[in-house]
Amino acid sequence: GRRVSDTVEGDRRVARFVSKQPILGFFSVQSAAYEVARRQHGGVTLEIYYNPGHDFNVERMLDAMEAALDYYQAHFGPYQFDYARIIEFPGYASFAQAFAGTIPFSESIGFIADNADAENIDYVTYVTAHELDHQYWAHQLISSDQQGSTMLVETMAQYSALMVMKQLYGEDNIRRFLKYELDNYLSARGSEAIEELPLERVENQGYIHYRKGAVVMYLLQDRLGEDRVNEMLAGLLDKYRFKGAPYANANDLVGGFMSLARNESERELVNDLLKRITLYDLKADNAKVRKLADGRFETRIEVEADKFYADGEGRERKALLKDSIEIGLFTQKPGLGAFDKGDVISMKRYPIRSGSQDITIVTKTRPAFVGIDPYNKYIDRNSDDNIVATE
C-alpha cells in the first residue's frame, strides 16, 4: 500500500501503510538506508529501493518493469495498483518474491549481477518480469490448495516472463532461456525423492512448475498461437479475479488449452505436455549440402526421433511420435551471443515420425548449421545433438 503516516512514538518508529485495493494477508517488511530510483509509466510509479553503490542494474530493472507491465496490461487486464516496488535485501538468500505491489529482490540475483557479456542470460530482466506477473497470477487469481495449484502461479509467471523476453530479444534469441530451463529440469529429475508428477498434478516441485513449465508453456503458445493463449488466460483471470472460493485449479487451465486445440495432433500435444510425463529424443545427423545448377543449395539432413512416456519413478516406455517439428537452417549456430534473426535461412515445421527419416530442403543461401527443434521447445533428453554442422 501507500505510506499514510510515519511517526516516532517513544523509542519506536511507527509507519502505517494502507492499500486501496484488496490484498492477501501476505506481506513482507524491509527497512534500510535505501537509495530510491523512480520512474512514472502509464500512471504507475515504479520504484527501486537499493543499497547505495548497488545501482548497476537499476535502470535495467526499471526497463523490465515497463516492458512487463505493458505486456501484461495489454493481454491480461489492468494492473491493480498505482505503484510497483522492488526492494533489495542482502544476499544471504538468492530469490525474489512477489507481495502486493512489492517485490523483495536479493542483491545476489539482481543488483550485483554482471550482464555485460552477451552470452549470459539476462536473468535480471527475466526474474523482474516473472515476479511482476505474480500480481496477476497469485494476487488477482488465487489457485486452490490442491495438486496442480502452482501451475496457476509459478508456471504462469514463467510463461509471462518468457513472452516479455521474446518481445525484448526476439524469437531467435529465446533458445538460451529455454535451454537453461530444460537442462535444469532434466538434471533435477534424478534428485526427486518421492515421485515426479505431470504438470497438471505438480505438488510444489520447483523443477516441474518452474523449469519444465517454462518449456511446456513456450511450446504451447508456439503451436496454439500466442494471441489465442493470451485470450484464454485473460478469460480465466476475468472469471476468478479477486474472488474467493471456489478457486481456480489446474483443470481450468488444462481445459483452456484443450479448447484451443484445433486437431488431434494438437490435442495429443496438450495431453503429452500437461497430463503426462513425456520425453523426446530428437537428433540431427549427416547434414550434407550440394549446390544445384540454378545456384540454390540442397540440404539433406538425417533425423532420428523418438518419444517416451515415463512414470513417477522414471521408468520409460516408447510411444508413437507423430508431430510437426521445426527444422532450421542457419549461417551461425543458434544460442551463441552473436546469433540473431539474420542468421536464420529457413525455419519450418515438417512431419516427424518415430525412427529415422531424411529431409531435403532447398534454399538460396548455403547453411552452415542444420537442426531439429533448434530452439529447444521440446522436452528433449539430449538437446546438445539437435544441431549439426553441414558438410
Residue ranges and their predicted role:
Residues 150-219, 223, 240-245:
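Acidic/His/Gly-enriched intrinsically disordered linker/tail segments
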